[in-house]
Amino acid sequence: MASVLANLASWRLVLLFVAACHHAAPPQHAANVYRGYASWYGEAQMTASGERFNPHALTAAHRTLPLGTRVRVTNTRNGRSVIVRINDRGPYGKGRIIDLSEAAAKQLDMIDAGVAPVTLEVVR
């Protein structure tokens, strides 16, 4: 009986430790950080937000983020970043998570490559 109680006490300690680890909170922004590939587009058209596309504005297209969301895009090849406003829907190319305006792509130094690995962080 004493060994059963000792075993039970040991398991309680293990469960307490596991529970304490489980409740450790991840960084608050972890759910708002995405990794993938960015591309850019420059043709004139209407955007999903109803505004005319402006290749000189710091804007972008994303499939699911609410229109108006501001996102920090970082080119992981060179560390350059830019904050863009989501005003359109897309991209529709395989493996891409954001389509940038020409101005945003220039700031990330990805015009010639056309596609770059990026991280996205929602800033508001």
Language-model segments: residues:
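Secreted/periplasmic proteins
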Residues: 2, 17, 21-124
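Short, low-complexity, charge-dense intrinsically disordered segments
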Residues: 1-13
